[in-house]
């Protein structure tokens, strides 16, 4: 019996326009009523999906949980109480940032524990964030010292092509020892840098242990490469129909529906209800 679902948000649970369907929300509520945890497991900040938690009936609820920043932060939804903080070492973050701002095409995102800062925001990326209710502070200076006393959870760059994103990875790894980094790609626009050993999969298992749930009792659903670690870590890995080929290959179940047609409701109805 499955006791927890960990689920990516963008392009998995959410429609392409960033909204949560009524059918998905109702299925999540039905799963919760059966005692099954539904845990958003997102690369985004927890602050950006509070309204969606409200729709799910999970906002500010005790004994309900969320994972943000590709595993960087595990929270209890009640008062957004941190259970685990997996931040980047300052010098690692500083090196990643330096590579990002050297590329004038890139919008470089710095996620602290509570706030998103962007250096060189670009219109297409800003529109994408706005559609998902993501707020950010524009950096007016490239001075990274301002983050010295903060928890930097991850740094990502928005770039238009995969070739650009792979070159950015190479540029970062020319400055920062690759063994200190976990690197993924998401949303057909981002290359993402977390500290080594921190990903959606380790966080899902970590939360499971806190709740007395084994990996075999967890369902994970996703669509993109930053979801692969959680699919590989759990008992039932699921790809939505619009998932990339690598995610579909890692899945034991591929939904008939895509993210715009209630794929998560399909999963919950098939395996939980």
Locations of regions flagged by a protein language model:
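Mg2+-dependent phosphoryl-transfer enzymes with acidic/Ser/Thr/Gly-rich catalytic loops
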Residues: 1-4, 21, 192-273
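Short, hydrophobic/glycine-enriched beta-strand segments
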Residues: 3-8, 39-40
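Active-site phosphate-binding/coordination module
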Residues: 20-125
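A generic "binding-loop/recognition-motif" signal
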Residues: 45, 70, 114, 189, ...
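Short, structured coil segments at secondary-structure junctions
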Residues: 56, 62, 70, 179, ...
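Conserved acidic, metal-coordinating active-site core of Asp-based
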Residues: 99, 105-221
């Amino acid at each position: 019996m499955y006791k927890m679902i960990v689920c990516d948000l963008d392009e998995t649970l959410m429609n392409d326009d960033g909204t949560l369907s009524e059918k998905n929300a109702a299925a999540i509520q039905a799963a919760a009523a059966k005692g099954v945890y539904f845990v958003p497991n997102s690369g985004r900040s927890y602050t950006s999906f509070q309204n969606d938690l409200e729709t799910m009936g999970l906002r500010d609820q005790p004994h309900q949980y969320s994972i943000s920043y590709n595993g960087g932060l595990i929270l209890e939804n009640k008062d957004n109480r941190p259970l685990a903080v997996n931040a980047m070492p300052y010098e690692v973050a500083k090196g990643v940032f330096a590579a990002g701002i050297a590329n004038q095409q890139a919008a470089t995102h710095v996620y602290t524990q509570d706030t998103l800062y962007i250096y060189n925001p670009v219109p297409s990326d800003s529109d994408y964030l706005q559609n998902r209710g993501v707020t950010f502070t524009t950096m007016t200076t490239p001075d990274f010292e301002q983050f010295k006393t903060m928890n930097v959870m991850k740094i990502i760059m928005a770039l238009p092509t995969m070739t650009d994103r792979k070159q950015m990875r190479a540029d970062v790894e020319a400055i920062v020892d690759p063994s200190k980094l976990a690197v993924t790609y998401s949303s057909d626009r981002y290359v993402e840098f977390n500290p080594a050993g921190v990903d959606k999969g380790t966080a899902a298992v970590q939360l499971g242990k806190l709740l007395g749930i084994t990996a075999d009792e967890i369902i994970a659903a996703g669509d993109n490469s930053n979801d692969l670690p959680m699919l590989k870590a759990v008992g039932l890995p699921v790809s939505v129909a619009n998932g990339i080929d690598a995610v579909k290959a890692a899945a034991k179940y591929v939904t008939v529906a895509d993210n715009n047609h209630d794929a998560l409701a399909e999963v919950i109805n098939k395996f939980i209800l």
